[in-house]
């Protein structure tokens, strides 16, 4: 597990590179996961899942923001496959510069 983490109130956010995910913990319990796959210089943010009983508390937004900041620090472009991530970036245009472009897309040859 990557030691990159941040505290968001009672929620701890962790970059779990071994499992290709970001995770949000309350105590020792995983309450949200954002799955990704790195393809060269592009990080595909594939899906975001928040435990139903934790929905509506901003945990999804916090984990997406954490993933975007981590990607920025690592110099990665973003492919927002996940609808929740796409919506977050639309509402927060300060992350639009991270979006994958034809120049940053990995070769598919």
Predicted regions and their residues:
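Conserved acetyl-CoA pyrophosphate-binding loop and the N-cap/start of the following alpha-helix
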Residues: 54, 58-63
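Conserved beta-strand-loop-alpha-helix junction that forms the acyl-donor binding cleft
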Residues: 78-90
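Short, charged, intrinsically disordered terminal tails
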Residues: 2-13, 17, 92-109
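Conserved beta-strand in the GNAT
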Residues: 29-37, 44
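Conserved acetyl-CoA binding element of GNAT-fold acetyltransferases
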Residues: 42-52
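Conserved acyl-CoA
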Residues: 62-77
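Beta-strand-connecting loop/turn residues
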Residues: 18-20, 41
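Conserved beta-hairpin
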Residues: 20-31
């Amino acid at each position: 597990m990557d030691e990159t983490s941040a505290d968001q109130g009672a929620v701890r956010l962790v970059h779990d590179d071994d499992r290709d995910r970001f995770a949000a913990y309350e105590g020792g319990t995983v309450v949200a996961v954002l799955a990704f796959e790195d393809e060269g210089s592009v990080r595909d943010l594939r899906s975001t899942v928040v435990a139903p009983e934790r929905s509506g508390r901003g945990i999804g937004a916090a984990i997406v923001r954490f993933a975007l900041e981590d990607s920025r620090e690592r110099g990665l472009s973003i492919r927002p496959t996940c609808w929740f991530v796409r919506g977050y970036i639309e509402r927060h245009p300060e992350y639009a510069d991270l979006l994958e472009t034809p120049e940053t897309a990995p070769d598919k040859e």
